[in-house]
Amino acid sequence: MAKMQAKVQQDERDDGLREKMISVNRVTKVVKGGRILGFAALTVVGDGDGRIGMGKGKAKEVPVAVQKAMDEARRKMVKVSLKNGTLQHEVVGKHGAAKVLMMPAKEGTGVIAGGPMRAIFEVMGVTNVVTKSHGSTNPYNMVRATLDGLQKMSTPGEIAAKRGKSVEDILG
């Protein structure tokens, strides 16, 4: 099966969400009469203010697969709390054989991330972050690992509430 990496495309609609297509794969289903060709698309959608969603779609034609993926990404959006355009703290995300390390960065650093991770941070509204991926470089696994790490991230207020202390005690 041939694999095609699509260019990352951005499309702003009237709802203010940013959309990026991460990859499109050509897939085949072998049946008695031969092969049935189809396409699988992977996309991310964000609002530029910490909300992010991932979707995948399959269809016989590329535009239909991409539209299905975009619709799923819009339905599955989650909120991630950011701190001045970067992450709250260093975090590691895992999915399958993919492991992703994400670190907050000071102002002016930019988004230092490869492939699918860069698309996620751009649609999310993160402007300064440093990332490193280990293991699997499969786009689907990297996106899931990145989202896993972002969902593990907690704010100083949440940590203080868990420990029964004030935010000032936590921050030192």
UniProtKB/Swiss-Prot annotation:
GO cellular component, one term: small ribosomal subunit
GO molecular function, one term: rRNA binding
Every S5 DRBM domain range: 17-80
Keywords: Ribonucleoprotein, Ribosomal protein, RNA-binding, rRNA-binding
One BP annotation, GO: translation
Zinc-finger is among the record's keywords: no
PROSITE patterns named in the record: RIBOSOMAL_S5 (PS00585), S5_DSRBD (PS50881)
Biological function: With S4 and S12 plays an important role in translational accuracy.
UniProt remark on domains: The N-terminal domain interacts with the head of the 30S subunit; the C-terminal domain interacts with the body and contacts protein S4. The interaction surface between S4 and S5 is involved in control of translational fidelity.
Family the entry assigns: Belongs to the universal ribosomal protein uS5 family.
Subunit architecture: Part of the 30S ribosomal subunit. Contacts proteins S4 and S8.
NCBIfam families according to UniProt: rpsE_bact (TIGR01021)
Name of this chain's protein: Small ribosomal subunit protein uS5
Organism this protein belongs to: Cupriavidus necator (strain ATCC 17699 / DSM 428 / KCTC 22496 / NCIMB 10442 / H16 / Stanier 337)
Gene: rpsE
